[in-house]
């Protein structure tokens, strides 16, 4: 890749502007207008391409010769897609539990794939080791200012689509990159008064644990089926975010997240992974209504935006297996 074409690739964002549509079904459940930000239609399958694409483009401008990314799947696919666009070799380090379909997708993007450890944190150690090689750059799935800067583009799109600020933004938290990006975006567009409902599953609730403790907390293990939320420790930036905007942290059980995936499939005819189900459970499990009753959210919300963060770690067979495992009716 040479000359003007290379410069164009490095300048144009890799993410696409995604639809923001009101959901009749979820609005009926919530008793208020619910708008869905469909990040699951990103070309890399999730919102991750916003931040990671931006990061990789900046690293390419600085002369990076090889990218390496530890991932539960979604970040790796975003990094592999970005590397392929930039013509840079990439190594993706995944936990051994990663599905074969994700590995196939990564290899299809031309990535070298290494499977290491039980959870993401262990894969991340290997990625950091590889990043010490000359010319190699580690792509954090969530913990870098360029990642947050790229993810902030999502809020700029919300501002362009909505006439007025939403009553709340609902999102899932894993390592905290989406949360940090949304906070950055809200501050940028002057919507810092909009509360954020930050959803996690029990067993991957490192952000909730950190808020309760008032400091970063490392979970002993990731026991949730929502593997894409599986960072034992969130980014330190998330605690700062909770001071800059109103962030309401909520934890749901795996069963609630998986039931939300099934209901969303029935309602919207789209299949997302349990990590995304955690955000959808804010509506389906009545959490928004409870927060209103408790006075933590306004009793008269004009609308709510739920970020459908996407996900590549799911199939119809996996969903059925999860429903059986968790005894979901």
UniProtKB/Swiss-Prot annotation:
The modification N-acetylmethionine is found at residue 1. CDD domains: L-Ser-dehyd (cd06448). GO terms for molecular function: glutamate racemase activity; identical protein binding; L-serine ammonia-lyase activity; pyridoxal phosphate binding; threonine deaminase activity. InterPro entries: Ser/Thr_Dehydratase (IPR050147), TrpB-like_PALP (IPR001926), TrpB-like_PALP_sf (IPR036052). The modification N6-(pyridoxal phosphate)lysine is found at residue 48. One of its GO terms (biological process) is lipid metabolic process. Optimum pH is 9.0 for serine dehydratase activity and 8.0 for glutamate racemase activity. Its EC number is 5.1.1.3, 4.3.1.17, 4.3.1.19. Its cofactor is pyridoxal 5'-phosphate. Optimum temperature is 45 degrees Celsius at pH 8.3 for serine dehydratase and glutamate racemase activities. It catalyses: L-serine = pyruvate + NH4(+); L-threonine = 2-oxobutanoate + NH4(+); L-glutamate = D-glutamate. Keywords: Acetylation, Isomerase, Lipid metabolism, Lyase, Pyridoxal phosphate. Coiled coil: none annotated. Serine dehydratase activity is inhibited by manganese chloride, ferrous chloride, cobalt chloride, cupric chloride, nickel chloride and zinc chloride. Glutamate racemase activity is inhibited by manganese chloride, ferrous chloride, cupric chloride and zinc chloride. Monomer. Homodimer. PANTHER family: SERINE DEHYDRATASE-LIKE (PTHR48078:SF16), THREONINE DEHYDRATASE, MITOCHONDRIAL-RELATED (PTHR48078). Belongs to the serine/threonine dehydratase family. Catalyzes the pyridoxal-phosphate-dependent dehydrative deamination of L-threonine and L-serine to ammonia and alpha-ketobutyrate and pyruvate, respectively. Also exhibits racemase activity towards L-glutamate and D-glutamate. This is Serine dehydratase-like. It comes from Rattus norvegicus (Rat).
């Amino acid at each position: 890749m040479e000359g003007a074409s290379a410069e164009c690739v490095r300048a144009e964002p890799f993410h696409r502007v995604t639809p923001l549509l009101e959901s009749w079904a979820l609005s009926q459940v919530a008793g208020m207008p619910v708008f869905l930000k469909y990040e699951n239609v990103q070309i890399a399958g999730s919102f991750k391409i916003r931040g990671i694409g931006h990061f990789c483009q900046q690293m390419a401008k600085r002369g990076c010769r090889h990218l390496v990314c530890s991932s539960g799947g979604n970040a790796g696919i975003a990094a592999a897609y970005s590397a392929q666009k930039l013509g840079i070799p990439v190594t993706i380090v995944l936990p051994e539990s990663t599905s074969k379909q994700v590995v196939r997708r990564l290899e299809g993007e031309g990535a070298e794939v290494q499977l290491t450890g039980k959870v993401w944190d262990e894969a991340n150690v290997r990625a950091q080791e590889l990043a010490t090689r000359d010319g190699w750059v580690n792509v954090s799935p969530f913990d870098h200012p360029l990642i947050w800067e790229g993810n902030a583009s999502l809020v700029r799109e919300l501002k362009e689509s909505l006439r007025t600020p939403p009553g709340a933004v609902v999102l899932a938290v894993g390592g905290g990159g989406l949360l940090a990006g949304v906070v950055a975006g809200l501050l940028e567009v002057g919507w810092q008064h909009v509360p954020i409902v930050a959803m996690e599953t029990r067993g991957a609730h490192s952000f909730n644990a950190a808020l309760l403790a008032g400091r970063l907390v490392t979970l002993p293990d990731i026991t949730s089926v929502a593997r894409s939320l599986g960072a034992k420790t969130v980014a330190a930036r998330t605690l700062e975010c909770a001071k800059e905007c109103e962030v309401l942290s909520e934890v749901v059980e795996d069963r609630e997240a998986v039931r939300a995936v099934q209901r969303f499939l029935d309602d919207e005819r789209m299949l997302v992974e349990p990590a995304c189900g955690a955000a959808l459970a804010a509506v389906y499990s009545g959490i928004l209504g409870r927060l209103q009753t408790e006075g933590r959210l306004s009793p008269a919300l004009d609308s709510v935006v739920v970020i459908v963060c996407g996900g590549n770690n799911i199939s119809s067979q996996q969903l059925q297996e999860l429903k059986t495992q968790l005894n979901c009716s």
